[in-house]
Amino acid sequence: MSDGEEDQTAIVCDNGSGLVKSGFAGDDAPRAVFPSTVGRPRHQGVMVGMGQKDSYVGDEAQSKRGILTLKYPIEHGIITNWDDMEKIWHHTFYNELRVAPEEHPTLLTEAPLNPKANREKMTQIMFETFNVPAMYVAIQAVLSLYASGRTTGIVLDSGDGVSHNVPIYEGYALPHAIARLDLAGRDLTDYLMKILTERGYSFVTTAEREIVRDIKEKLCYVALDFEQEMATAASSTSLEKSYELPDGQVITIGNERFRCPETLFQPSFIGMESAGIHETTYNSIMKCDIDIRKDLYANNVLSGGSTMYPGIADRMQKEITALAPSTMKIKIIAPPERKYSVWIGGSILASLSTFQQMWITKQEYDEAGPSIVHRKCF
């Protein structure tokens, strides 16, 4: 690092499918958290001099969502629209953090088992468009484990676009046992939109989907026993809650509150053939060496926004206990700040002195090209 230690602070940017979390290494929380959306007007502007733009990013897109079509450039953890992604990064550096990217090493995050081209293109844009001096791409779940202060454990990271299980032993990720499930928060929002329609509330536009996401975040929970909860909901109104829509209309939601996140445990609800998150966790542990399974069972770390439902830790405990050997000690770790634990782990990693030789420098990139990212990043 140069003399200007302060100027060279690394930037940590966890670009999730739903939210971008960004800030400076060494901080204990991200400075900027905003939706990874780009909105474009769906109407013709008529007021001259309003300074209307052809696109809006993040919170501004959210606040004007009534007149915009919102698009998320990251789907299931994979960047599908690079032009919009560039807008989001530009917004992150210049508007949210107010820094010049050419002065700061930048740590980005990625879901495991992503297409290789995805991280190559990320590397290319960082060096060629934003001229960063150095960068690194880290696996999200590994960072969550850092944040929990462990070196061994199995992380279930579930965000808006993708859920994955990554077993890590003494700091080494075990790639053969990584499980990825393309079922996460956005699918739950879509499912909630669908089951609310059955109740007679229609939500269709991209803006209305954001309202449903808010309902999901405020009112949904995971039932400990799904069948029993369904029976309770059918026989009484004790589980019903009301929600006021932006136009003042009040809607009531009952068993939808737990039917929505139940999809994580029963993906067949949305027509997916996959096993639920409890089973993928168990299968992932079973793919690991018999000697380390005990340590993994005792360190089940939850991370990401879709693990924030009340009741999810107890339910995981119950489901994994049912699958595991009867004498096994099973512990689910659900840190309160798990929504941001990927970012926090990145902040810890990027400020370690031992990490400084891991950065991909501009010079290395110029010599080897984008494929350098596979050699230097796990």
From Swiss-Prot:
What SUPFAM superfamilies does this protein map onto?
Answer: Actin-like ATPase domain (SSF53067)
Subcellular location(s): the record lists: Cytoplasm, Cytoskeleton
The record's InterPro entries line, in alphabetical order, gives: Actin, Actin/actin-like_CS, Actin_CS, ATPase_NBD
**CDD domains under this entry?**
ASKHA_NBD_actin
Enzyme Commission number: 3.6.4.-
Record keywords: ATP-binding, Cytoplasm, Cytoskeleton, Hydrolase, Muscle protein, Nucleotide-binding
Substrates-to-products reaction catalysed: ATP + H2O = ADP + phosphate + H(+)
Kindly list the residue ranges recorded as spanning the membrane: none
Q: Could you give a GO molecular-function term held by this entry?
A: hydrolase activity
Q: Which EC class does it fall in? A: hydrolase
Q: State what this protein does.
A: Actins are highly conserved proteins that are involved in various types of cell motility and are ubiquitously expressed in all eukaryotic cells.
**Similarity comment text for this entry:** Belongs to the actin family.
Protein name per the record = Actin, muscle 1A
Gene that codes for this? MA1A
